[in-house]
């Protein structure tokens, strides 16, 4: 499920980042889909990551569909954020 264009999260990374490779491997093994953007090849993405991180190009940076941001998270933190985004089933009144 990795590298999914319409995934609920975007992974900003670099090819030579060991933390990025570790996180991608863990998300791949967990079946978590994501869109990957290499900040060394995409100047706009690099600017966004620097803006998010107070002027620093910190990777891996994950941006979720609800605009929540995690920097160098564990796969468990990614799962928790995805779970918090899942819609809660509504219960009809009177039930």
Model-derived segments and spans:
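Structural micro-motif
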Residues: 53-62
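Local sequence-structure signature of Cys/Sec-based thiol-disulfide redox active-site neighborhoods
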Residues: 1-33
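Short alpha-helical
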Residues: 18, 43-44, 57, 77
């Amino acid at each position: 499920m990795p590298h999914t264009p319409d995934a609920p999260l975007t992974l900003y990374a670099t090819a030579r980042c060991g933390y990025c490779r570790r996180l991608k491997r863990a998300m791949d093994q967990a079946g978590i889909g994501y869109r990957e953007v290499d900040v060394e090849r995409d100047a706009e993405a690099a600017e966004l990551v620097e803006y998010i991180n107070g002027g620093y190009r910190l990777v891996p940076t994950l941006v979720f569909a609800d605009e929540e941001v995690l920097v160098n998270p564990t796969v468990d933190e990614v799962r928790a954020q995805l779970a918090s985004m899942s819609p809660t089933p509504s219960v009809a009144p009177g039930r």
